[in-house]
Design a protein with these regions (language model features):
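Primarily the HKD phosphodiesterase
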Residues: 2-76, 176-180
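Beta-sheet entry/capping signal
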Residues: 11, 38, 91, 98-99
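Short, surface-exposed amphipathic charged segments that create phosphate/polyanion-binding patches used
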Residues: 55-58, 96-101
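Signature of lipid phosphatidyltransferase scaffolds
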Residues: 100-179
Length: 180
């Protein structure tokens, strides 16, 4: 129901433990959506630990980098907010009309598993879930800006250079005025 409902929605929220990093046709489809107001993705990074031993460090670094590459906000044609929540194990998917709460991860691999869940079509229940659950998860998550933040840093750096030039010019003018 969630995937079929995408054509009638302007918003999508995905809260999931795992986004399969090898091939994820569902995520690739989301990247192509253009008429959405917003997509919010909140996920964990499976296999991420507080401490690593031996060659696990390199393996974990590669897995984390796969997630970052896969969820790079600039790779989506619509506005997307990506968050990481390392305590999250829930699977909740919301569109404008439908909510799924269940055991299925957001991946193509889940279609081959026996999964259980409920579908909610009540607007009131959807709104209540958003307000009481999703917002709390989002507030306790870490926002991932990806390369987008670098773009903004470069823009701000350009503005700072212009401000420095204006400041220098003003100083010179003030000095000239004081000399007269």
């Amino acid at each position: 129901d969630i995937i079929e409902n995408l054509d009638r929605s302007k918003n999508l929220i995905i809260v999931t433990y795992n986004i399969f990093t090898k091939t994820n046709l569902i995520l690739e489809r989301l990247k192509l959506l253009e008429n959405f107001e917003e997509i919010i993705i909140i996920t964990n990074i499976p296999g991420r630990f507080e401490q690593y031993y031996g060659n696990q460090n390199e393996k974990a670094r590669k897995e984390i980098q796969k997630y970052l590459d896969l969820l790079e906000p600039l790779n989506f044609k619509t506005h997307v907010k990506v968050y990481f929540n390392f305590s999250n194990h829930s699977k909740i998917y919301l569109t404008d009309e439908v909510v799924y709460i269940g055991s299925g991860n957001f991946s193509d691999a889940s279609k081959n598993n026996i999964e259980a869940g409920v579908i909610i079509k009540s607007h009131e229940q959807r709104q209540k879930l958003y307000e009481e659950v999703i917002k709390k998860i989002e507030l306790n998550s870490i926002r991932y800006f990806g390369k987008e933040i670098e773009k903004h840093k470069n823009k701000l750096s350009g503005y700072l250079k212009k401000i420095d030039l204006i400041t220098d010019t003003l100083r010179e003018l003030i000095c000239e005025f004081n000399d007269d």
